[in-house]
Amino acid sequence: MKIQILCFTTLFLAIFTSQVTTAYKFKFDYFGNGTDPISFHGDAEYGPDTDGKSRSGAIALTRDNIPFSHGRAIFTTPITFKPNASALYPFKTSFTFSITPKTNPNQGHGLAFIVVPSNQNDAGSGLGYLSLLNRTNNGNPNNHLFAVEFDVFQDKSLGDMNDNHVGIDINSVDSVVSVKSGYWVMTRSGWLFKDLKLSSGDRYKAWIEYNNNYKVVSVTIGLAHLKKPNRPLIEAKFDLSKVIHEVMYTGFAGSMGRGVERHEIWDWTFQN
């Protein structure tokens, strides 16, 4: 396991004012030596390899042998997202993930990148709630939840558009915006959309960015072995300063349904 963590403070001085900016940056090339600053909640664990004994180098958010399994993996260090109560630092993250069905038909449900107020999983339940929320607190503005979901099961009661979509969740698993999974490529005749089946078992790369000046969230996905597509899959305007506290935690959550499906994170970078 190779991890690079950098925390630094830069002081900008002006004639009449000064501003302190705290930035946090880390990188995991893989997981599993037992010293990663990652805490597991629910059924999350270091992923098992194909032999069932050694570790795969990934984080597994669900377990094959537990029906309706769900869990979270959280970076243990709290991160400063705001210099004060109103402003919000820009941030960006990228990670490689895979969703692999082990039974047929595919029973879902998916995984999500999360920014949450606490390093625990007491509010999350399985199935379509993706270990993010539950039936009681879903939609509560006091959740202070930001998530980007990669959903592979259509739960119409939660507003899912289909069984293969990417969505932005704010305090609710009813996404404020969702689109069919895929990526854009530029051709001689213009932009061409290519579908990506999230539950194919293939490894995909996701890039999530927040521009604090324009208050824009962008989400891009693509094949893990290719470079980042030039056009985002989602680009939507949201003021996250009203959602995210000054100090928050970040990580991943996932859940499966009646069937067995493996939800894994293979590498991860974060910077604000």
UniProtKB/Swiss-Prot annotation:
Chain spans, region Legume-lectin like: 24-271
By its UniProt entry, which InterPro entries does this protein fall under? ConA-like_dom_sf, L-lectin, Legume_lectin_dom, Leguminous_Lectin
**Cellular component terms, GO, for this chain's entry?**
apoplast
Q: Name one GO molecular function term.
A: carbohydrate binding
Indicate where this protein resides in the cell.
Answer: Secreted, Extracellular space, Apoplast
| Residues carrying a glycan | 33, 84, 134
Q: Which UniProt keywords apply?
A: Apoplast, Glycoprotein, Lectin, Phosphoprotein, Secreted, Signal
Q: Which residues form the signal peptide?
A: 1-23
Pfam families linked: Lectin_legB (PF00139)
Taxonomically, which superkingdom? Answer: Eukaryota
Q: Where would you say this protein principally sits, based on its record?
A: secreted
UniProt modified residues of type Phosphoserine: 241
State the similarity comment.
Answer: Belongs to the leguminous lectin family.
What PANTHER family does this protein map onto? (RAPE) HYPOTHETICAL PROTEIN (PTHR32401:SF33), CONCANAVALIN A-LIKE LECTIN FAMILY PROTEIN (PTHR32401)
Protein known as: Lectin-like protein At1g53070
